[in-house]
Regions:
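Short, conserved active-site entrance elements at the starts or edges of catalytic domains
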Residues: 121-159, 178-181
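Gly/Pro-enriched, hydrophobic low-complexity segments
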Residues: 21, 88, 151-246
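Bacterial N-terminal signal peptides
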Residues: 6-18
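N-terminal mature ectodomain segment of secretory-pathway/periplasmic proteins
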Residues: 30-107, 139-146
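Acidic/charged, solvent-exposed loop-and-adjacent secondary-structure segments enriched in E/D, K/R, S/T
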Residues: 100-129
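Short, low-complexity, Pro/Ser/Thr/Gly-rich segments in the mature regions of secreted, periplasmic
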Residues: 241-257
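Positively charged n-region of N-terminal signal peptides that target proteins for export
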Residues: 1-5
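Cleaved targeting-peptide boundary
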Residues: 22-30
Length: 257
């Protein structure tokens, strides 16, 4: 009887010890966020990045159609994207308060204000540092969910609940701690949509690393769109008017060649 009690006690102690060791080895949210910030260049470098211009191409329909692409960000929360083909330019912009678009490929050549649901993705694009940096100040909550396989990589998985209730699952590379995938669940026009974005080929813009390969689309959809960035520029001069709803179209300043 005593032997059985001793064996049970030892077994329980081993289980507790193993659980404690596992808990101890699990990184915390703060540790992962700190490593993510450091991987991007550090807090000082991020603060020093006032504007960011990305130039390249947008591939759609499995790469059969190629558009010229440009995105420009300005702190604190302004963004504008342009995609051009055959003399027509699709524009989407957000000035920190409202979003608007020009959709010539759909026969709509005049600027139109975007609905609160339609502008959600653009608001996320306006976050130059991503959802993890300063997450508390943004009103987000972040939870560590362990590791999950991302195309053969055991990535750290973080759940980010935004202030508006939308959820993003952020996957960090276990060695470099940069984002390699973001799965966002948002309510749009009364229905939930899941958008999966894969990020890679990080390059420096000034002193900050940014992804230059971006593939995105609805989760499970094989026909995803891909952005390939050929040029990254940090702290370029930008006028605020390009983000505001215009009475007429204002083109982006072109990158220097």
């Amino acid at each position: 009887m005593h032997l059985r009690l001793l064996i049970a006690f030892i077994s329980a102690a081993l289980v507790v010890s193993e659980c404690f060791a596992q808990d101890k080895s699990q990184p915390t949210v703060d540790e992962l966020v700190a490593k993510n910030i450091e991987a991007k260049g550090g807090a000082s470098a991020l603060r020093g990045l006032g504007t960011l211009r990305l130039s390249g191409k947008l591939l759609v329909q499995e790469g059969q159609i190629q558009l010229t692409y440009m995105q420009i960000n300005k702190r604190p929360d302004e963004v504008r994207t342009e995609a051009s083909l055959q003399g027509m330019t699709q524009i989407e912009a957000y000035d920190g308060k409202e979003g608007w678009k020009v959709s010539p490929f759909f026969g709509r050549k005049d600027p139109e204000r975007m609905s609160a649901d339609d502008v959600k993705a653009l608001v996320e694009d306006a976050e130059m540092d991503g959802p993890l940096v300063d997450w508390q100040a943004k009103g987000n909550t972040v939870e560590y969910l362990g590791t999950e396989d991302v195309d053969g990589t055991p990535a750290h998985k973080l759940k980010v609940v935004r202030k508006n209730g939308d959820v993003s699952f952020v996957y960090l590379d276990p060695d470099h701690f940069l984002e390699i995938r973001v799965l966002t669940q948002r309510i749009r026009h009364g229905a939930q949509e899941e958008v999966e974005t894969d990020l890679g080929d990080y390059e420096k813009a000034g002193d900050v690393f940014v992804p230059t390969s971006i593939e995105f689309g609805r989760k499970g959809d094989p026909d995803k769109q891909r952005i390939i960035i050929d040029k990254v520029e940090a702290n370029v001069p930008v006028v605020d008017t390009i983000f505001h709803f215009p009475g007429f179209q204002i083109g982006l300043p072109q990158p220097q060649r």
